[in-house]
């Protein structure tokens, strides 16, 4: 272990001496320190200003450190091989796999230090912005919706199976299922289920619905504890900028102590909105009941998607949420380090950097690429939009995207900006999947190639 750590210390010193590393560090520090004075958000609320700063700063840290990691991991081995400096190491009594592991440890240790320093600057700048003067409602929104950690509970979905069975029974009695195959009947059942689910999430003009949010772990007796109803209404006609007028009341009608006053409000469709609710509206079973009515004259409103209507409640503090987000970013950097080092064992620096950048871009856009590949498939008997290349390229692209880790699976920056919890499960998943499995596999392959290769061999 002492040999690995010696190589790691040498790698850190080498990275600090590298001009490109210093440039990245200076640029990142300058931007992080200047952003608090330049971001404006929506130009009205301090909440929006803090959210804009967190989004830009954390996104910038992840982007710049990813670039720095790719450059350092692809250049440290490749440059030593190209400049023949590796021969001085090869003659020493240290196995090549330990040399490879020391390189990885040095780069990820430097990344960890830079992440901690960046996190401290982000936290300090956020604290500075928090102290800026603003009006009371904006201050409350900042504390309750950004500088906190909230867990989201989705609407409790009722059991539609009895209603589906009744509809199927009527169709069978009418003889409309007699000549239909088993798969066709299954499709009919799924369509009915989706129709009922959509209707349950739909509010016609003048119509009201009762929704419930269960398992809310809040202190009902504390008047300072509040929840937020987080929702995104949509117009069933797909029209933008429609004003949704709603009337709602929170509380359990079987427990008058939980009933809150009736409220009304206007909300623009296709945008997320948050409405504060006192914790006293939650009943003894930890359930929040909501009755909401559409008082818009003509428009039908739909809450589409699993995240279109949630109840949020606080469970922690901002700084630990920030630390978890930085931990996930570090796991991604550790994977990129292993990838860059493995590529540089048999490729020259430009080619290794190009390959690593390609995988970084695919990993970042993995979710979008998967949807794009699926969308490029022909529908039914329609001609293939990719002509004769489609049957060949789509499977290859699907396999490539499947092999590359999906960085878009988790959004730690978005959760920090929205005051949402960065789950510990995300951190564990990133650590296991990116570092202990995929990173370890790349490290073993890279160490094996580096051990077997002829150092004097020319790489391209």
PLM regions with names:
Residues 38-47, 124, 129-315, 362-447:
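Terminal transmembrane helical anchor/hairpin motif
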Residues 1-6, 43, 312-316, 320, ...:
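Short, membrane-interfacial amphipathic segments enriched in basic
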Residues 24, 64-65, 96-123, 338:
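Selective transmembrane-helix segments that form parts of the transport pathway or gating/packing helices
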Residues 1-22:
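Aromatic- and glycine-rich beta-strand/loop motifs that create alpha-glucan
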Residues 75-106, 330, 450:
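Helix-loop-helix units of permease transmembrane domains in multi-pass membrane transporters
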Residues 452-460:
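Short cytosolic juxtamembrane segments of multi-pass membrane proteins
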Residues 24-30, 352-363:
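Central hydrophobic cores of alpha-helical transmembrane segments
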Residues 57-79, 114:
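Long, hydrophobic alpha-helical segments
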